[in-house]
Swiss-Prot record:
GO annotation, biological process: FMN biosynthetic process; riboflavin biosynthetic process
Name this protein carries in UniProt: Riboflavin kinase
Note on cofactor: Binds 1 Mg(2+) ion per subunit.
Binding residue positions for Mg(2+): T128, N130
Molecular function terms, GO-annotated: magnesium ion binding; nucleotide binding; riboflavin kinase activity
Length: 225
């Protein structure tokens, strides 16, 4: 199990967004451990690929990796659940981002399109709304797996195999829609793709960079996984 406390201390001195220079003799003041223990634990974090570390004269240069940041995001989500009442919906907010056009291609594939219609009860517009989540919402995104979802099965059309994924029922500014999360994706974790029966950009008069709020429902469609 990674040393969460050391990750938190590194984050507090700025190692999330930049490379910081520290020495074991200085860092132990933040943790209360001896310099020797601090050096050993920092080395272990590097071994677990939670930080990047380079020894330099007078100390070491340290920056947290995406893997390390993800662990802290999960901690944030768990503490949020402990100290706040559970809302009926989970809100994710971010900014509209120009897509790569892949959504239109995949939505039009019959093996997917039929499942969307049968399981989501709407025929999706051939395209997705891509939203880059804010920092807070990016952390909360890990809670998607706790929300009701609809399973979209993978299939083979005789020529190639298409992977499966999950759809999470949402409302985007009052419009019923779904967040699509493929089992395999090359997109970063702070990006979500939304499908809807209408072109959301036109219906909500959205352009690149506009802020949009997505509400994930806690009830509904549980029996359709």
């Amino acid at each position: 199990m990674p040393d969460i406390e050391y990750l938190k201390k590194l984050a507090l001195i700025g190692a999330v967004n930049k490379t910081v220079k520290v020495s074991s003799s200085e860092f132990h003041k933040h943790t209360g451990d001896s310099s020797k223990t601090a050096a050993r634990k920092l080395k272990q974090l590097e071994k677990e690929r939670l930080i990047e570390r380079e020894l330099v004269p007078g100390g070491q240069l340290i920056k947290m990796t995406e893997k390390g940041i993800e662990i802290l995001k999960n901690e944030y989500v768990e503490y949020s659940r402990i100290f706040s009442s559970e809302p009926d919906t989970l809100e994710l907010e971010g900014n509209v981002l120009k897509g790569l056009g892949e959504g239109q291609y995949y939505i039009n594939i019959p093996g997917y399109r039929t499942q969307f219609e049968e399981k989501l009860h709407f025929i999706p517009f051939p395209g997705t709304l891509n939203v880059q989540l804010s920092e807070n919402s990016s952390a909360l995104r890990n809670r998607l797996r706790e929300m009701p979802s609809v399973r979209i099965d993978g299939f083979n059309d005789g020529e190639r195999t298409f992977g499966g994924g999950n759809c999470y029922p949402v409302r985007v500014e009052g419009i019923d829609a779904a967040v699509v999360v493929p089992d395999r994706t090359h997109y970063p974790s702070d990006l979500i793709e939304i499908i809807a029966p209408v072109k959301l950009r036109d219906a909500l008069k959205l352009k690149d960079g506009d802020r949009v709020v997505t509400q994930l429902k806690k009830q509904g469609m549980e029996g359709q996984k």
